């Protein structure tokens, strides 16, 4: 560990395997001082795609994992930490994608970028967010959707709580959540809090067992946006394609960011329920259609992003998305 600290402090980059080994040390035997020193040195130098991938692999190595007999598995977990307090997009989108027929292994946590994260909203809605791995695996197999709370599946992360809190700044761990799905998701829509991270995270994903993914940043949002353009890196096997996406490309209208503002966990849960029942329409529904459509697209259930939006609309209007929400609550 000391060797890694000295090298990174000196400006050297770690390989994927070295970063993976450093992560192992962080979770197993490094002191808090060593952990803090390494994280600070990486931040000062700037984490490379290989280092992020290596840390993600090391975090997966230490995780409790599941292997649902369903596939391809899709996740909509993003980094959080964006500039806006919106409705909870990733969770609602995941339920809509599940309603469209995707097998969803939703990875999430409590709030980072909004008043309520995935776990906050689902907990208020009556979902057992702290379900053990075997229960989540069965839920995905039986219902086509399950929620994996990060602290339950990544107990080794306790080792970095103290150092991260004392450092008081973003570290490599701020981007690892979406890269460490405990079910080994095959397809992802992965929102990031900074546009500069889009190509970096896309390259990091190339080291992970993901077949299809969209890494997105929507003009300040870690989601596909309606208020402005979205920067996208699309991963399809070994190929990465970068482009810009507008609401018009999806057949949707632009809307100001204020139109999709979030609130308390209860208010966000009410919006989630309302979108799924059809009682909430307009920009909030459209924002979910955009992001659920992307998940449907990477799951292979639509030939285009705009086609994914149409499938998402049908999943809501038919009641299928609401049925998935009910099944998750009853599991």
UniProtKB/Swiss-Prot annotation:
GO terms for cellular component: cytosol. It comes from the Archaea. Anthranilate 1 binds at residues 78, 109. Its EC number is 2.4.2.18. Mg(2+) 1 binds at residues 90, 223. One of its GO terms (molecular function) is magnesium ion binding. Binds 2 magnesium ions per monomer. Mg(2+) 2 binds at residues 222-223. 5-phospho-alpha-D-ribose 1-diphosphate binds at residues 78, 81-82, 86, 88-91, 106-114, 118. It catalyses: N-(5-phospho-beta-D-ribosyl)anthranilate + diphosphate = 5-phospho-alpha-D-ribose 1-diphosphate + anthranilate. GO terms for biological process: L-tryptophan biosynthetic process. The keyword Ion transport does not apply. It is an enzyme of class 2 (transferase). Disulfide bonds: none annotated. SUPFAM superfamilies: Nucleoside phosphorylase/phosphoribosyltransferase catalytic domain (SSF52418), Nucleoside phosphorylase/phosphoribosyltransferase N-terminal domain (SSF47648). Homodimer. NCBIfam families: trpD (TIGR01245). Belongs to the anthranilate phosphoribosyltransferase family. Catalyzes the transfer of the phosphoribosyl group of 5-phosphorylribose-1-pyrophosphate (PRPP) to anthranilate to yield N-(5'-phosphoribosyl)-anthranilate (PRA). This is Anthranilate phosphoribosyltransferase. The gene is trpD.
């Amino acid at each position: 560990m000391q060797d890694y600290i000295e090298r990174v402090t000196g400006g050297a980059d770690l390989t994927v395997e070295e970063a993976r080994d450093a992560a192992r040390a962080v979770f197993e035997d490094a002191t808090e001082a060593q952990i803090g020193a390494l994280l600070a040195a990486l931040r000062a130098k700037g984490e490379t795609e290989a280092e992020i991938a290596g840390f993600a692999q090391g975090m997966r190595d230490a995780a409790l994992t599941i292997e649902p007999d369903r596939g391809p598995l899709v996740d909509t977990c993003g980094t959080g930490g964006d500039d806006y307090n919106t409705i909870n997009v990733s969770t609602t989108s995941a339920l809509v994608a599940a309603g469209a027929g995707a097998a969803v292994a939703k990875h999430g946590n409590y709030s980072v970028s909004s008043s309520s994260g995935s776990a906050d909203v689902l907990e208020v809605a009556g979902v057992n967010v702290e379900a053990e791995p075997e229960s989540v695996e069965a839920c995905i197999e039986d219902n086509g959707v399950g929620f994996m709370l990060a602290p339950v599946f990544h107990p080794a992360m306790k080792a970095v709580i103290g150092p991260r809190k004392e450092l008081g700044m973003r570290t490599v761990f701020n981007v690892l959540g979406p890269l460490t799905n405990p079910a080994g998701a095959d397809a992802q829509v992965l929102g990031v809090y900074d546009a500069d991270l889009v190509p970096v995270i896309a390259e990091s994903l190339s080291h992970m067992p993901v077949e299809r993914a969209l890494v997105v940043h929507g003009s300040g949002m870690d989601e596909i946006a309606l208020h402005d353009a979205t920067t996208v890196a699309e991963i399809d096997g070994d190929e990465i394609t970068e482009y810009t996406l507008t609401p018009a490309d999806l057949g949707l209208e632009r809307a100001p960011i204020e139109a999709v503002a979030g609130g308390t966990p209860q208010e966000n849960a009410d919006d989630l329920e309302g979108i799924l029942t059809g009682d909430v329409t307009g920009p909030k529904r459209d924002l979910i259609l955009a992001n659920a459509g992307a998940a449907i697209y990477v799951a292979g259930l639509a030939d285009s992003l705009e086609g994914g939006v149409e499938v998402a609309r049908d999943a809501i209007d038919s009641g299928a998305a609401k049925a998935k929400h009910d099944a998750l609550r009853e599991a």
